[in-house]
Amino acid sequence: MNKVLKNSWALFLGMGFLMMAYGYQGSLLGVRAVQEQFSLTATGFMMSGYFVGYFIGAMTIPNLISRVGHIRVFAAFASLASLVILVHSVFVNPYVWFILRVLTGVSMVCIYTVAESWLNDRSSNKNRGSVLSIYMVILYGTMGIGMFLLNFSSPENYEPFILVSIITSLALIPILLTKKKPPTFKKIKGMPLKELYQTSPFGMVSALFYGTIQSALFTLLAVYAAQMNFSIFQISLVTFLLAISGAISQFPIGKLSDMFDRRKVIVIATFGASLFALFAIISSGQMYLPGELATSKTWFFIFLILFSCCSLPMFSLICAHTNDYIPKEKFVAAGAGIQFTFGLGAMSGPFLCSIFMNIVGSNGFFVFLLFFHALIGIFGIYRMRVRQSVDNPDSQFVAMPSTITPAGIELNPTTEPIEEPKKPEEIPPATNL
């Protein structure tokens, strides 16, 4: 573990700053959109821009990295991300913000790709599982911390946007000053969607639906809380609890999925998330209950934590389930295909959720989450009836962030061994004849 931190501390520190800025930015824009009285559909459309950019970037960035190198690309797009957030405070318009969110999405997928290929290059077959675990803790932990920065200054002011830009710029310093040589970039081709569906229909469909869920969850939760008249501190607490509780639950739920049919664990988790989404609606105070049945926000926080514990491990569960049906040498290609499918769903999530909120009211946010989790669960029950589970000794649960790129998927210790540089053979000393 110490060796992992010693070799990659600059990268971990830089990514920590970036995720802190990312967590802060998401909550900041959501609350500011409510304060500016953007319509719900305009807000959902604007927030979806990030995932459009992420999807576009994932298709185009690998060629750019191959041409100009990791460090230049990282510096260029981290600078772009730092610049773009400042422009939000100058042009307060949902359609301008959509374009800016696209640019942010392109920048972030580029940064993830560079960071994860770098981590992959510095990992060995013995420690890549530890590297992935540390990476996940840093991503979720610093993102949660960033959400609390919402209390720094009112979202109506310029200061929060300046602070996000400063934190993003700080991420450049440890990366650019590292003495380590950048890795040789390796393009990874995802599994064709037709082959992926034939291999694991449940895995592919679940990834598509879960993309809509998670993109809406992380972009519109702050909007929902602001519409429910939560204080700024309560909004930051809500978003923090979502990230941290979901990260903590990855490992116990993952262990259960290794012990039982993974589809059963996914089905139970999705219906559990649907149930706790319903309880969150009831505890929100907008169910027009009699006074003696009214509930406090404390119960809402509890149900949100339980919802997150059921929902956020889903991406890792879907990847592990897909791997159950394929040989080890295809794990990385299948993971890239699952990530591509997840991205397709993510592009539509915020906009679809905003339509639910327009029709139902603020609690349409949780109605949307309930509905799509239930769809995954129902499809899972159907698939269990038409296909037997399999026992693949090469496949096991590995917690992975949904933002992971194909380069990061290779950190999964269950994939094929990565090529490590060979030590030069020792030449025996010359002897007298």
Where are these regions (language model features)?
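Intrinsic disorder in cytosolic terminal tails and internal cytosolic loops
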Residues: M1-K3, F185-G190, R383-L433
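Helix-loop boundary and gating motifs at the non-cytosolic
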Residues: N2-F51, G203, Q214-Y224, M228, ...
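Loop-to-transmembrane helix entry/capping segments in MFS-fold secondary transporters
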Residues: L40-T41, N125-Y135, I232-F233, I326-I338
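Helix-to-loop junctions at the C-terminal end of transmembrane segments
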Residues: G57-H70, S154, S249-D261, M357-N358
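Structural signature of the two symmetry-related core transmembrane helices
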Residues: R72-L86, S165, K264-F279, L370
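Cytoplasmic helix-loop-helix junction between adjacent transmembrane helices
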Residues: V102-V137
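Intracellular juxtamembrane helix-capping segments at the cytosolic ends
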Residues: C110-S123, L312-I326
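C-terminal membrane-cytosol helix-exit motif in multi-pass small-molecule transporters
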Residues: L150-N151, S165-F185, I376-R385
